[in-house]
UniProtKB/Swiss-Prot annotation:
Disulfide feature: C4-C22, C8-C18
Organism from which the protein derives: Opisthacanthus madagascariensis (Scorpion)
Compartments, record wording: Secreted
Name recorded for this polypeptide: Potassium channel toxin kappa-KTx 2.3
Superkingdom field: Eukaryota
Single annotated GO MF: potassium channel regulator activity
Length: 23
């Protein structure tokens, strides 16, 4: 899994936002 998304989810829990931010 993408480490960016992993970290993002730990902070926000928002999968959609993390996918957008990390693409």
């Amino acid at each position: 899994n993408d480490p960016c998304e992993e970290v993002c989810l730990q902070h926000t829990g928002n999968v959609k936002a993390c996918e957008e931010a990390c693409q």
